[in-house]
Amino acid sequence: YDLRRTVADVISDNYFGTLQTLCNKAGVDFTAQATGNGLSLVADNLQAKGRVQKPQGEFWAKHIHGSYDIKEASSAAHIYGKRIASAEAYTDAKFSQSLAELKNLADFAYAAQVNEFVVCASAYQPWLDKYPGSTGGGRHYCLNRNNTYWEYSRPFWDYQARCAGLMRKGMPVD
């Protein structure tokens, strides 16, 4: 136990804590999936996430019942008095997934008290005449201007902005 605790403390304090200090000095926001789902890593995930300005988890679009750490990120935010609980969102969303399916995932994350999404997307789309364009080395990053529903997706994004804004106004509940 002592060795594991020492390693967890070093990762939390000397790595994530040091990065947060450097970001503070530079005036840079710092969000991190601090140790995340690194199950083989000797760490205290709540402690590590508590050392960063914005604790972050992630949820994937293809594993709707996956082992996500979004509740861990929101718990760290609550325990350590942080207003933002962040999540990498919609990782590996496919072109065949509808906005309704993605909204269900968003609602799942909001229920876990996540109030900031960092959308996993491929904004790099250099070609104007090739579809689906660059999808990120075989990954299914469909959340970009080349998706056929993109021009109709504004209400989807507005909904998420409203939910995140509303959640940041309140206080977490148990």
Predicted region positions:
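Carbohydrate-binding surfaces of carbohydrate-active enzymes
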Residues: 1-174
